[in-house]
């Protein structure tokens, strides 16, 4: 299935173009997340602490079928600023298994990494589906938390900092944090299929987030250095998985 993509940095648009694009993003997002709080997307896109906001939009036969809003947030700490990348991806049901979407996000992130090589760049996101967790964890050994592998201390410090920005967080182990998220519109049959294929990664996710189907998300983290990004991109491209 051939997908065309367009990438735009929301932060670089004029006020008028931002308004037009935001309305388009909001309309599509509402199709996938009908239960989301209306101001949620607005707060993400117009957050003054977001320093870059690349948006990838996917098309099939001229029709938009998915979008990935990548927000890079600057956080001030006692030592040096941290740059936290998060992603809000929304796809029509027939297009949710396209690995190319991850490859596109890696490519955009790598461009930012090369442009600002001295910045501490982290990916922190709450994953709400076992298959999505498996997609990330199987592409890089530096993606945490993961089965039977201790999380490095610097990862845990950043994760602890970020979990304090959420509400109703549950700590289920030293390195496992979960909290309520907004699920995409999904049928019960689709939820079952999300965990049909047993694997080391899916088993780990199900062990710690068995209540994902009611909206609990597992907080995950990965340090986005050039080596990690290149390794993940190569693994996605070759269809290769890591334990």
Show where each model-derived region lies.
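Contiguous, well-ordered alpha-helical segments that form the cores/surfaces of helical PPI scaffolds
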Residues: 69, 84-88, 106-110
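Conserved acetyl-CoA-binding loop-helix of GNAT-fold acetyltransferases
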Residues: 96-111
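Conserved beta-strand in the GNAT
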Residues: 53, 57, 62-74, 85
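A short, internal acetyl-CoA/4′-phosphopantetheine-binding micro-motif in the GNAT/acyltransferase core
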Residues: 88-97
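A short, polar/charged loop-to-alpha-helix boundary motif
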Residues: 75-81
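Terminal substrate-recognition subdomain of acyl/acetyltransferases
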Residues: 1-22, 26, 30-32, 41-53, ...
């Amino acid at each position: 299935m051939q997908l065309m993509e367009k990438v735009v940095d929301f932060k670089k648009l004029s006020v008028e173009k931002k308004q037009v694009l935001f309305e388009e993003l909001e309309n599509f997002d509402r199709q996938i997340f009908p239960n989301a709080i209306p101001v949620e997307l607005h707060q993400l896109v117009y957050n003054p602490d977001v320093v870059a906001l690349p948006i990838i939009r996917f098309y099939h036969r001229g029709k938009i079928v998915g979008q990935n809003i990548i927000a890079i947030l600057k956080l001030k700490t006692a030592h040096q600023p941290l740059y936290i990348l998060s992603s809000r991806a929304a796809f029509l049901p027939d297009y949710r298994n396209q690995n190319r979407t991850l490859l596109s996000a890696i490519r955009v992130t790598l461009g930012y990494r090369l442009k600002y090589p001295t910045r501490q760049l982290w990916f922190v996101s709450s994953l709400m589906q076992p298959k999505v967790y498996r997609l990330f964890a199987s592409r890089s050994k530096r993606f945490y938390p993961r089965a039977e592998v201790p999380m490095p201390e610097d990862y845990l410090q950043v994760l602890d900092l970020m979990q304090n920005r959420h509400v109703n967080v549950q700590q289920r182990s030293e390195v496992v944090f979960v909290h309520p998220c907004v699920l995409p519109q999904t049928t019960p049959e689709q939820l079952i299929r999300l965990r049909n294929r047993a694997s080391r990664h899916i088993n780990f996710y199900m062990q710690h987030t068995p209540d994902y189907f009611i909206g609990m998300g597992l907080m995950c983290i990965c340090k986005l250095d050039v080596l990690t990004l290149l390794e993940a991109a190569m693994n996605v491209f070759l269809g290769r998985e890591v334990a």
